[in-house]
Amino acid sequence: MGQCSSATKMRRKRKREEECCRESMERRNKGCLAMVKERRSRFYIARRCILMLLCWHKYANS
């Protein structure tokens, strides 16, 4: 009877550890995704600004 109890406790402990690891990975993935979105938006803004400056320079002399 003691062995069954011990095995059950070990399974519960393993399950908790797996859940903890999964939650940690999900948090990390969300953080990475947020960082990628921010970088992408900053790059988009920079591209638009450069394009605007190039067009302004080209047509300002006309």
UniProtKB/Swiss-Prot annotation:
Q: What is the protein's membrane topology class?
A: Single-pass membrane protein
Q: Which UniProt keywords apply?
A: Cell membrane, Developmental protein, Membrane, Transmembrane, Transmembrane helix
Q: Where is this region: Required for DVL/RTFL small polypeptide activity?
A: 27-58
**Transmembrane segments annotated in the record for this chain:** 39-56
Task: Name the GO terms of the biological process aspect.
Answer: negative regulation of cell population proliferation; shoot system development
Q: Name one Pfam family in it.
A: DVL
Q: According to its UniProt record, where is this protein mainly located? A: membrane
Task: State if Transmembrane helix is listed as a keyword.
Answer: yes
* GO CC aspect terms: plasma membrane
User: Where does it reside?
Assistant: Cell membrane
Q: Give the UniProt family note.
A: Belongs to the DVL/RTFL small polypeptides family.
**Role description:** Small polypeptide acting as a regulatory molecule which coordinates cellular responses required for differentiation, growth and development, probably by restricting polar cell proliferation in lateral organs and coordinating socket cell recruitment and differentiation at trichome sites.
Q: Which PANTHER family match?
A: DVL19-RELATED-RELATED
This chain's protein is named Small polypeptide DEVIL 17
- Taxonomy-wise, where does this protein's organism fall, top ranks first? Eukaryota, Viridiplantae, Streptophyta, Embryophyta, Tracheophyta
